[in-house]
């Protein structure tokens, strides 16, 4: 075929072939097809084998999302749209800014720290290649947070907790002066173990931080965001 001889064609012939291929590509785009190129996913006939369990209580089981995704199969990377929308409504953010993982937030935080060590954050140097990595730890705080940074050998810096949240004078000073400080643990509402809720002023000061490190991150573990509703 002609593909095997591209290196023998003249410039004019190559241009003609390019025009032809673009026309074929345009026709494919116009056909409005949706192809799932992922591998290892069960077919619909296999998924239907479980319908007896799906329908045992309700014969009208609805397993499709609003965009037609079959929830009986492997999930979407960022979560099904309905779950993203629900969490977006609760957290008052756009669903495009929501990723629905599994139900273990500590795993997400651990994986995020781990990836920062092995691959870096948004193109910055992987933390494993740095001489020193430091972390701000409001105290008293959640011991499971501290165990993550301890596991990676991070130098943890205690920040006193006030009645309205962490000592922000100290936080602002430390992060602005030391680029080795890469993050801070936060439980902004009903902090573990004191039950302190960060004030609006503290939250605004967090949002306005000017860290020396481009890859500084606030780990905002808002686990109890809606508990007051119950």
Where are these regions (language model features)?
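Short, function-defining helix-loop hinge/capping sites that tune catalysis or transport
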Residues: 44, 229-230
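Conserved core of the PLP fold type I
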Residues: 69-214, 225-229
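Residue-level marker for buried hydrophobic side chains located in beta-strands
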Residues: 218-219
């Amino acid at each position: 075929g002609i593909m095997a001889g591209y290196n023998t064609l003249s410039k004019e012939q190559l241009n003609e072939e390019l025009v032809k291929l673009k026309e074929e590509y345009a026709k494919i785009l116009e056909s409005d097809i949706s192809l799932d190129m992922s591998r290892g996913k069960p077919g619909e006939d296999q998924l239907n084998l479980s319908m007896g369990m799906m329908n045992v209580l309700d014969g009208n089981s609805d397993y499709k999302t609003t965009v037609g995704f079959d929830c009986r199969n492997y999930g979407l990377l960022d979560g099904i749209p309905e779950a993203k929308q629900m969490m977006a409504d609760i957290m008052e953010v756009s669903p495009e800014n929501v990723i629905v993982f599994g139900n273990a937030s500590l795993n997400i935080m651990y994986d995020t720290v781990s990836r920062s060590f092995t691959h870096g954050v948004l193109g910055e140097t992987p933390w494993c290649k740095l001489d020193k990595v430091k972390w701000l730890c409001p105290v008293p705080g959640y011991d499971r947070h501290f165990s993550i940074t301890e596991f990676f050998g991070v130098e943890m810096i205690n920040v006193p907790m006030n009645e309205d949240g962490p000592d922000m004078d100290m936080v602002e000073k430390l992060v602005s002066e030391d680029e080795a400080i890469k993050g801070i643990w936060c439980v902004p509402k009903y902090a573990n173990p004191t039950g302190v809720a960060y004030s609006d002023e503290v939250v605004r000061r967090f949002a306005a931080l000017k860290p020396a490190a481009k890859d500084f991150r606030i780990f905002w573990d808002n686990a109890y965001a809606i508990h007051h509703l119950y």
